[in-house]
Each structure stands twice: as structure tokens, then as C-alpha cells.
């Protein structure tokens, strides 16, 4: 059984809420485009910003009309039917313009999509019609991008492989950053196991403004009977000298000295940000790659939950530090359902 420590409410109440995207339709019954920007850290209030941008929209295929063979077939615009919803993360860039200029440039993009497979299912994006506001992102947009299908598409199985598919941008999520980079805990360090150490994990509890049960995300009832969602992230490990005894008070004291501040961003959909404003041990600092501000995109932590709540209002209701013995190095991690070198199963 793990020991826990609940962080005070002030650690997440200032920037622990994300407002929902307004899902409104116009006279043509199409969703009205909207841009949503949140701030993480201490970005400049005016002028140049570092923006991480995520495009949200719909996958569409041309409607099959009657083959009349008339000249009007060449002049009439093609109508499309929606076959799914998804996103396109385009990353961080230095941006000089306004929010509305960015929105206009994003919805004017012509994006074609292809569903394919490597070790897992992938979505390929090819982009054209890149206007001036998007020039800071043009390098990666022109090259085309490939993403894990389960991270960027709500139902990749609904995307046909025998039809042309376009991605129509409707919403733009932007995260205005106080620094040029988003620091993530390297996987090798997150998987680090040391003897005589305690793993410090964070249990983040959220309140989402959308019903999630029908989409496969079951909420948990809190003490007041309210439906909440939660996920866990790994912060690091605390290590003591051989022979020293760990106590809950010792671990709590270590955590309190860090003076952690939590916030929500829109990196990859919904993202959880941790900023250490206090003192960190050298062991923990090295695990965080010597950064005091760390980002955990829900797209990486829990992709399906991210797909379900990325357009909704989201609020942090509590954050708990969970102290657990570090998993011994002798334990083998099996990333695949089929374990290699067992019986007649061999890795090719």
C-alpha cells in the first residue's frame, strides 16, 4: 500500500482550469471556427510569443454523387461527409501576429490525410496553402508529418483506405509558453530504477465538463459523489544512503521543499505542467534533465482520455504525491502482448 501527500489547493488553483471550446454552428450547420489560447509559466503579455499549436477538426471524404457526365460536374464544388474527428500537433514556434490571424491561416490550410501502418497504425498528414502567419511552422508543415493514429484520431478505424481524405481545421488550441522549449522527462530517466529508493508519482484528479462514459472513459466517484477522472505521472525518485530508513514525514518534507506549482495547458490536447519553485535534490534534478518546469502531455500519458476531453472544460481538483517503492531492476518490462523468447515465440 502506497503513502500519499495531498498538495494544498493554492498549488493548482491559479492556472489549473481550461475553458471549453464553444461548439456553435452557423447557418450552414457547420461548426464556427474558434481559437483557444492558454498561458503556462510567465509568457510576455504583448508582442512576440512562443506558441505551441494543436489543430483540431474533422476528417472528411468526398460525397459520391451521380455520374451524369455534364459540364456542370466540372464547375460545382465537391461536398464532403465527415468520417471522423482528430487533431494535428504542429509544435512550437516564435509567433508575431494576432490570435485571429493565426486562426484564419489555420482554417485555410489544405490538408490531405492517409491512414497507414508501421509497427502500429499511423496517420500521415500532407499540408498545402501555408499563409504568412504560419511561416514560423512552415518547415515541418511542408515536410509532412506522421503520428500514432490512436493519439490523433478518435476512431482511426473509421478512416477509409480506398478514398481521398482531407482534414478540415475548425479549432485551434494554443499554449503561450514562458520559455522556448517544453521540457519532458526523458523515457530512460522515467524508467530508472535504483536500489534503496522511493518513486515519487503524482496522482492528478480532474473534473471534465463532458460525459465520458459512452466513449470508454469511466469516471471515479469522489467522497461527495461527484464524477472525476484521474491519471498518474512519474516525477522522479528519492534515494537515501544504505541503512537509512524512509518515513512518510521524510518524503513529505522533501516534496514540500520543492514548492511545486501545477497548471493545465493545451499541448497535444490537454497537458499537465509542473513547475518547481523551491529546492530539488541533485538526484531529482538530474532525472528532470536539470529543468524546473516539466510538461506531461495527456496525449502521451493517456491518449484515449485526451481524445475524449480535449475540447471540454477541464479543472484540476486535487494533486497527490504517491510514494511507492521503486520497481526493482530485476522486474522485466513487456511492452508487447507477445513476450519474446518464450516457448516457440521468437522475435524476427
Swiss-Prot record:
Keywords: Disulfide bond, Viral envelope protein, Viral matrix protein, Virion. Belongs to the morbillivirus/respirovirus/rubulavirus M protein family. GO terms for cellular component: viral envelope. Pfam families: Matrix_Paramyxo_C, Matrix_Paramyxo_N. It is found in: Virion. One of its GO terms (molecular function) is structural constituent of virion. This is Matrix protein. InterPro entries: Matrix_C, Matrix_N, Matrix_Paramyxo_C, Matrix_Paramyxo_N. It comes from the Viruses. The lineage of its organism: Viruses, Riboviria, Orthornavirae, Negarnaviricota, Haploviricotina. Disulfide bonds join 251-295. It comes from Human parainfluenza 1 virus (strain C39).
Amino acid at each position: 500500500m502506497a503513502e500519499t501527500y495531498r498538495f494544498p489547493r493554492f498549488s493548482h488553483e491559479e492556472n489549473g482550469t481550461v475553458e471549453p471550446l464553444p461548439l456553435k454552428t452557423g447557418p450552414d450547420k457547420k461548426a464556427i471556427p474558434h481559437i483557444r489560447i492558454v498561458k503556462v509559466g510567465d509568457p510576455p503579455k504583448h508582442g512576440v510569443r512562443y506558441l505551441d499549436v494543436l489543430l483540431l477538426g474533422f476528417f472528411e471524404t468526398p460525397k459520391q454523387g451521380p455520374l451524369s457526365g455534364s459540364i456542370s460536374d466540372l464547375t460545382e464544388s465537391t461536398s464532403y461527409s465527415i468520417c471522423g474527428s482528430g487533431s494535428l500537433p504542429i509544435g512550437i514556434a516564435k509567433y508575431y501576429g494576432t490570435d485571429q490571424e493565426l486562426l484564419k491561416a489555420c482554417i485555410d490550410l489544405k490538408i490531405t490525410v492517409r491512414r497507414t501502418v508501421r509497427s502500429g497504425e499511423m496517420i500521415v498528414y500532407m499540408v498545402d496553402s501555408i499563409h504568412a502567419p504560419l511561416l514560423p511552422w512552415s518547415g515541418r508543415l511542408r515536410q509532412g508529418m506522421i503520428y500514432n493514429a490512436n493519439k490523433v484520431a478518435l476512431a482511426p478505424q473509421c478512416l477509409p483506405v480506398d478514398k481521398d481524405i482531407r482534414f478540415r481545421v475548425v479549432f485551434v488550441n494554443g499554449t503561450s509558453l514562458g520559455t522556448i522549449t517544453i521540457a519532458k522527462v526523458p523515457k530512460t530517466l522515467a524508467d530508472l530504477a535504483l536500489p534503496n529508493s522511493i518513486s515519487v508519482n503524482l496522482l492528478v484528479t480532474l473534473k471534465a465538463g463532458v460525459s465520458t462514459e459512452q466513449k470508454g472513459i469511466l469516471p471515479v466517484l469522489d467522497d461527495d459523489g461527484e464524477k472525476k477522472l484521474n491519471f498518474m505521472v512519474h516525477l522522479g525518485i528519492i534515494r537515501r544512503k544504505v541503512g537509512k530508513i524512509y518515513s512518510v514525514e521524510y518524503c513529505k518534507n522533501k516534496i514540500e521543499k520543492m514548492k511545486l506549482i501545477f497548471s493545465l495547458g493545451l499541448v497535444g490536447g490537454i497537458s499537465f505542467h509542473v513547475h518547481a519553485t523551491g529546492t530539488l535534490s541533485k538526484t531529482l534534478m538530474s532525472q528532470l534533465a536539470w529543468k524546473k518546469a516539466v510538461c506531461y502531455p495527456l496525449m502521451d500519458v493517456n491518449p484515449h482520455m485526451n481524445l475524449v476531453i480535449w475540447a471540454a472544460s477541464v479543472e484540476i481538483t486535487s494533486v497527490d504525491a504517491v510514494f511507492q517503492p521503486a520497481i526493482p531492476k530485476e522486474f522485466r518490462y513487456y511492452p508487447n502482448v507477445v513476450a519474446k523468447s518464450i516457448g516457440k515465440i521468437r522475435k524476427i
